[in-house]
C-alpha cells in the first residue's frame, strides 16, 4: 500500500510539474532583471548551510530569499521566509514551503529559483519559477541516487516508500529533470548520469564550499574521525567493524565519531559487543567540528551513498587523509594514492589494511594530506566558489 501511494504521489506531482513547465516556458518569461534569487530547501546543519548558501549570497548577484524551516545564520543580502507552525500543521512542511515560495513571487519577484533535491524542493522551484517567468535551477543534492529507480533508495519518506525501483517514477523523474534551465551536480559521476539521460540544458559541476583559512592543529592526536548522521545511510555499523579490525593490529588505536542520529544506541551496543569500548568515542553533536578535524590523521566514511561529503572536504582542508567508500562522487576528491583512498563499500578488509598502513607510515600520510588540502583549496575554497557562482548565475540570467 505504501508503495502504491508513493507511486501515485510522485507520478502525479512530476506529471503536473512537467505540464506546468511545458505550458509556461517562454510564455511568461520576464525581461526585467530583478537582482534576486529564491531558494527552497531543507538545511539540516550550519555546515551544510554555509557550504551551499554562503557562496550564493557572496556571489554578488543580488538578494537571496531563502524559504526553509528556520533561520540558521544571518548574512548580508539574505532574507529568510520561514512558514509558521500553523502552516506546517495544515499543509505539511513541504506544502507550507511550496505556498511560501509561491507567495514570494508576488512579494519579491526573482530572476532565478533554485531547489535542492528533486522532491519536493526542486519541484517547488520549477512550478513557481515557471509561473513567475524566472530561470529554474535543480541541484542534485544526492546525485543520481535521487533519480535512479525513482529515488527509492534516498533519505526521503515519500521516495523511500517505493521500497524498490520504479520504472514509471524514474522515467518521469528523468523527464522532469530535463525541464530545468540549469542542473548543478557535485561531481563527474552525477554529470555523466545526467548527460546519459538526455539533459541538454546548462550543466555545471559545483561542490559545496569550505572555509580553507582556518587554523590547523600541529597535534594529530585523533587516529580516525567520522563526522555525520548516525543512520543506516552512512553505515556507521560498517565503520565499527572496520575499527575492530584495525584495533587488532594497533591496540591503542582511537576512533572518534562526531554526530548523532537514530542508530546511536544500537551502535553503542555494537561497540560493547565488539569489545572496542577503549577504541571508540561518541562525541554527539559538536560546535567545534573544524578543530576536531584538524586533529585527525584520517577521515573515514563507509557510507552506502554520498554525493560529495562536505565533512570530507572540510577534513581534507585540515590535512586529514580521506579513506572513504567508492560511491557517488567521492572518488573525484579521494584520488587513490594521491589525496586519499576510495575503497569498495563492501571491502571491509580493504578499509582495515589501508587504515593500518597509513597510520604506520607518517611520511606517506603527510604526502597525501598535503595533496588533499591543495586540491580542496583549489576547487572548493569558499571565495573561489562564490566567484564561480557569480559567473554561473549571470550567464544563466543573460
Please give the residue ranges for each predicted region:
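Conserved donor-binding/catalytic core segment of Leloir-type glycosyltransferases
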Residues: 37-39, 210, 216-234, 239-243
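Short His-centered aromatic/hydrophobic patch
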Residues: 115-121, 140
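Membrane-proximal helix-turn-helix segments that form the acceptor-binding/catalytic region
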Residues: 131, 162-182
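A conserved nucleotide-sugar
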Residues: 225-228, 236-282, 360-364, 398
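Aromatic "clamp/platform" in nucleotide-sugar-dependent glycosyltransferases that forms part
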Residues: 285, 304
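Short hydrophobic beta-strand element within catalytic cores of glycosyltransferases
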Residues: 321-324, 334
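Conserved acidic donor-binding segment of nucleotide-sugar-dependent glycosyltransferases
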Residues: 336-337, 341-348, 357-362
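A short, well-ordered alpha-helix in the C-terminal region of glycosyltransferases
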Residues: 350, 357, 364-379, 385-391
Amino acid at each position: 500500500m505504501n508503495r502504491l501511494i508513493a507511486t501515485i504521489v510522485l507520478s502525479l506531482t512530476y506529471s503536473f510539474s512537467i505540464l506546468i513547465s511545458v505550458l509556461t516556458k517562454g510564455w511568461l518569461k520576464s525581461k526585467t532583471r530583478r537582482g534576486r534569487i529564491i531558494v527552497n530547501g531543507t538545511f539540516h546543519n550550519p555546515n551544510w548551510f554555509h557550504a551551499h548558501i554562503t557562496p550564493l549570497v557572496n556571489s554578488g548577484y543580488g538578494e537571496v530569499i531563502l524559504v526553509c524551516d528556520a533561520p540558521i545564520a544571518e548574512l548580508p543580502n539574505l532574507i529568510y521566509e520561514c512558514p509558521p507552525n500553523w502552516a506546517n500543521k495544515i499543509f505539511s512542511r513541504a506544502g507550507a514551503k511550496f505556498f511560501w515560495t509561491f507567495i514570494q513571487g508576488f512579494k519579491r519577484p526573482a530572476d532565478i529559483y533554485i531547489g535542492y533535491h528533486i522532491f519536493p524542493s526542486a519541484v517547488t522551484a520549477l512550478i513557481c519559477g515557471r509561473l513567475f517567468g524566472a530561470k529554474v535551477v535543480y541541484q542534485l543534492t544526492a546525485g543520481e541516487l535521487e533519480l535512479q529507480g525513482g529515488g527509492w533508495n534516498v533519505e526521503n519518506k515519500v521516495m523511500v516508500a517505493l521500497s524498490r525501483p520504479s520504472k514509471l517514477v524514474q522515467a518521469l523523474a528523468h523527464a522532469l529533470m530535463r525541464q530545468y534551465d540549469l542542473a548543478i551536480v557535485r561531481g563527474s559521476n552525477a554529470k555523466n548520469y545526467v548527460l546519459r539521460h538526455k539533459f541538454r540544458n546548462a550543466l555545471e559541476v559545483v561542490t559545496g564550499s569550505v572555509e580553507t583559512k582556518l587554523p590547523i592543529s600541529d597535534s594529530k592526536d585523533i587516529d580516525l574521525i567520522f563526522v555525520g548522521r548516525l543512520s543506516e545511510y552512512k553505515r556507521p555499523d560498517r565503520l565499527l567493524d572496520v575499527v575492530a579490525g584495525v584495533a587488532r593490529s594497533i591496540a591503542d588505536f582511537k576512533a572518534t565519531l562526531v554526530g548523532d542520529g537514530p542508530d546511536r544506541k544500537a551502535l553503542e551496543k555494537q561497540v560493547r559487543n565488539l569489545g572496542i569500548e577503549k577504541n571508540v568515542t561518541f562525541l554527539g553533536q559538536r560546535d567545534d567540528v573544524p578543530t576536531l578535524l584538524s586533529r585527525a590523521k584520517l577521515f573515514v566514511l563507509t557510507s552506502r551513498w554520498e554525493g560529495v561529503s562536505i565533512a570530507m572536504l572540510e577534513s581534507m582542508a585540515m590535512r586529514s587523509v580521506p579513506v572513504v567508500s567508492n560511491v557517488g562522487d567521492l572518488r573525484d576528491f579521494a584520488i587513490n594514492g594521491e589525496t586519499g583512498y576510495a575503497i569498495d563499500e563492501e571491502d571491509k578488509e580493504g578499509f582495515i589494511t589501508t587504515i593500518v598502513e597509513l597510520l604506520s607510515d607518517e611520511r606517506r600520510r603527510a604526502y597525501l594530506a598535503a595533496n588533499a588540502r591543495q586540491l580542496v583549496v583549489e576547487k572548493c575554497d569558499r571565495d573561489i566558489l562564490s566567484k564561480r557562482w557569480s559567473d554561473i548565475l549571470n550567464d544563466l540570467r543573460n
